[in-house]
Amino acid sequence: SDMASAPTCSPLTSPAIAQSAIAAAVAKPVSLPEMSIGSEKAPVTITEYSSLTCPHCAAFGQNVFPMLRSKYIDAGQVRFVFREFPLDIKAAAASILARCIGKDDPEKYLAAVEILFKLQDRLVAQTKDTLFHVGKMHGMSVQEVETCEKDQTQFDKLNADQQYAAQALRVTSTPTFFINGVRLQGALSFEEFEERIKPLLK
């Protein structure tokens, strides 16, 4: 029987074949444009599933991500892929706004995500006002933010990507990271990332 629903502790190392299969499943194109930074040729790919209302995700974004970026991503050793896994409608609405701001530019998108993380408490308490505020910071009118939030196609794509992550990749909580196909759940420190990245760079 399938024990996927039982609480499990994942081993840190899985057989190479399973790992490469998972890596391929993670790399499968999703419905929304891929938001990634770093070299396409980087030996390590980190894919994060994140919710904009999740405090652990915000902590990673503000404390760990800048260090990963300066040491590994900008150096061409790590490619970083940011994927949405909204845990509630507020997070979904914030993700859609970040998509409208970023369009096809991952840097603009990540800048919007960074601001939304900084304003997370406000986003949760006063969702609409915060979305308008962040939109305005990026030159969007109230009308443009409202139009963005009414785009059902975007929400459907977001939902499809989340369903795939939940079913095929067994993502159940945020943040969840995949480092070259190894799944790690929860907020990791920079040191914990480094421990896992370094052996892959040899």
Which residues make up each language-model segment?
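Extracytoplasmic thiol/disulfide redox context detector
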Residues: 1-86, 159-167, 201-202
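C-terminal cap of thioredoxin/glutaredoxin-like
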Residues: 9, 14, 19, 51, ...
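Residue-level signal for pocket-adjacent positions within structured domains
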Residues: 30-32, 118, 179
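Short capping/connector residues at structural and topological boundaries
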Residues: 40-42, 90, 189
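Structural motif
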Residues: 43-44, 107, 172
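Structural alpha/beta surface segment adjacent to cysteine/selenocysteine redox centers
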Residues: 50-52, 58-136
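Secondary-structure boundary/capping motif
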Residues: 56, 89-90, 157, 185
